[in-house]
Amino acid sequence: TIIQGELGTKLFLQNLLNQTSVCFDTETTGIDALNAELVGMSFSWQKGEAFYVPFPENNGEAQVLVDKFKPFFESETIEKIGWL
């Protein structure tokens, strides 16, 4: 499922913050972490179901979206499983 728009993002974040364990991955423009741009993030907490959040090309708009995920990444009650 692709998450789009402010309402879609808000509803997705509410659902995300209610999970106990989440697998996530970042999609970037390259493998060099110092120079790559974030283009999206994917999340899954249930077998066979995943969500993709595309990021705007504009760095300012992308940062606003990244900041909305701060409560998820800073939560100590949600296990985060990164994909390599």
Please give the residue ranges for each predicted region.
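Long, highly charged low-complexity segments
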Residues: 1-41, 55-72
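Functionally constrained cores in energy, signaling, and assembly domains
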Residues: 6-9, 44, 80-83
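Acidic beta-strand-to-loop metal/phosphate-binding motif
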Residues: 23, 77-84
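Residue-level recognition of conserved structural "scaffold" positions that shape functional pockets
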Residues: 37, 47-49
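Function-dense linear segments that define catalytic or interfacial modules
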Residues: 42-47, 54-57, 80
